[in-house]
């Protein structure tokens, strides 16, 4: 099963997002795709508006990709484009924030927890209990939501 990480950022925070991205890229389990989903509203010139260190990550790591959307989905930008991009595939999607770093075994331990609860389709993995802060979703759950996400946005 694929492991995908969806992350987003905006112009006021993009300068520090490389620290977060590096912590995801250096996990004990290699992620199949780390997708930085951005919007043209915040980055009208695409990659030209991004810090050099973030663009360099895309060149260095074959599993790190930068995508630009015409519409700003706000918090949903870290998930909706990735769900659409991988429609029909079997995967686990982590939606992570751009303003923190993750322990090196964060994804590995989260996957173990998800495997322990095979019937669980969505899991909050935040340390402070705030629902939705860091989420892990199975594709079977997201596929059910996709028509609503498509119509909503």
For the regions a language model picked out, list residue spans one by one.
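A conserved hydrophobic helix/loop-capping motif in glycosyltransferases and polysaccharide synthases
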Residues: 4-12, 27
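A short, conserved alpha-helix in the catalytic core of glycosyltransferases
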Residues: 152-153
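Residues at the starts of beta-strands that form the adenosine-phosphate
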Residues: 2, 32-33, 92
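Conserved donor-nucleotide/metal-binding helix-loop-beta segment in metal-dependent transferases, i.e.
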Residues: 104-127
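Conserved nucleotide-sugar donor-binding
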Residues: 131-148
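Short beta-strand-to-loop acidic/aromatic patch adjacent to the donor-nucleotide binding site
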Residues: 89-99
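Short, acidic, metal-binding catalytic loop of nucleotide-sugar glycosyltransferases
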Residues: 21-32, 40-43
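Active-site-proximal specificity loops/subdomain of glycosyltransferases
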Residues: 37-90
